[in-house]
Amino acid sequence: MAASPVLATTSHPIGHEAAVVTDADLDRHYAVKLAGKLNDEMAWVGQQFTGEEDFVVCLSEADVAEVNAALTAFQDTGLKPGYLSPETFKLPKLGPKLRLLSQRIHEQEGFIVLRGLQPWRYRRLENTIVFTGIASYIGNRRGVQCADGPVMTHIFDYSTEVEEKEKLNDGYLGHANRTSYLPFHTDDGHIISLYCLQAADIGGRTLLASSHAIYNHLLETRPDVIETLKEEWIWDSFIPEKPSFIRPLLLEQDGKLICNYRIRPFLGTPGYPRNAALGPLPAHQEEALNTVAEIAEKLSLKFEFKTGDIQFLNNLSILHAREEFHCAKGDTTRRHLLRLVQMDDELAWRLPPGLSKDMDKMFQHDLEEEKFIWSPEPLPYVIGQ
């Protein structure tokens, strides 16, 4: 399947005030300066994986029994889910294995799929506890996913209710909550964690692409695009109280390549276009966005995201996308995921100051204040997602 083209640029609706570009958190000095090809384990291409056994870790019956025991023990404490951690969700044998998987996510391939849970056996709150408890071994901190918002959100098929949900939320209903193709992108946060409560009936495969492999491909075929990605791009924040900002799409910190790639902040979406006060995106930058999307598609790993799977990925090194999907009618058969954004104090990458400032805010809250949304409701997409 060819990569979907990026959206055309249009002007902002009447009444939207001109944004002011701030230089307070510029990362211009952190544009990538790496010399030569990247040969680390993160520079993989999809074709090198011979089968799902290369990246899918299957839970044994003993592992699942240990998870169920941890679930019961945590419920007996009466603690709120915000207190879920390796100390309160004890997995004596599985826990050390999960910590090794966290190392793979931070230092090797950059992603992993955990398989073997049966979400239909758990109640709604129990699925939340199980997912959050397991995930706490991958990253010990959870980030809020919008201003003063929850740390856990739902990705749900709202394709038949788009207009209703957008009016209800007074906001844009992101591609993640529709059945259409979800283009390659990165999000906010260090680790993106997804738990599949209900897979799509048809389609909806996950696509992952290594930014390190994309960089190597560009180095050989389009070095000019690398130079473009290192430029000072003007990002639309889509938040009236937050000024737009300037940041390259390819960054470097401590010798690590960091990719911060999205489409919406530069070209907008239907109904929520880019702020006209920022000016149109230069043609060579739009070409760079398209080129990265095309290469990501070419080099990507594609796999089925099955009911019960938990997917963990390094958001700083991997671009992700999703194929179009179809579901039967009825809430019980709609595609439904739970989502966490995480970081790990021990293994997290250091970030350039501007990016660090934005991401740190996600994790600066008390555990008592962590919110978990119990029923599927769309999250307002406000920060370029």
Swiss-Prot record:
Function: Taurine hydroxylase-like protein; part of the satratoxin SC3 cluster involved in the biosynthesis of satratoxins, trichothecene mycotoxins that are associated with human food poisonings. Satratoxins are suggested to be made by products of multiple gene clusters (SC1, SC2 and SC3) that encode 21 proteins in all, including polyketide synthases, acetyltransferases, and other enzymes expected to modify the trichothecene skeleton. SC1 encodes 10 proteins, SAT1 to SAT10.
MF-aspect GO terms: oxidoreductase activity
Enzymatic class: oxidoreductase
EC number(s) from the headed UniProt entry: 1.-.-.-
Note: Trichothecenes are sesquiterpenoid toxins that act by inhibiting protein biosynthesis.
Any Pfam family hit: TauD
Protein name (database record): Taurine hydroxylase-like protein SAT17
Keyword Oxidoreductase: yes
Keyword Oxidoreductase among UniProt keywords: yes
InterPro entries: AlphaKG_dependent_hydroxylases, TauD-like_sf, TauD/TfdA-like
Pathway annotation from the record: Mycotoxin biosynthesis
Keywords (A to Z) from UniProt: Oxidoreductase
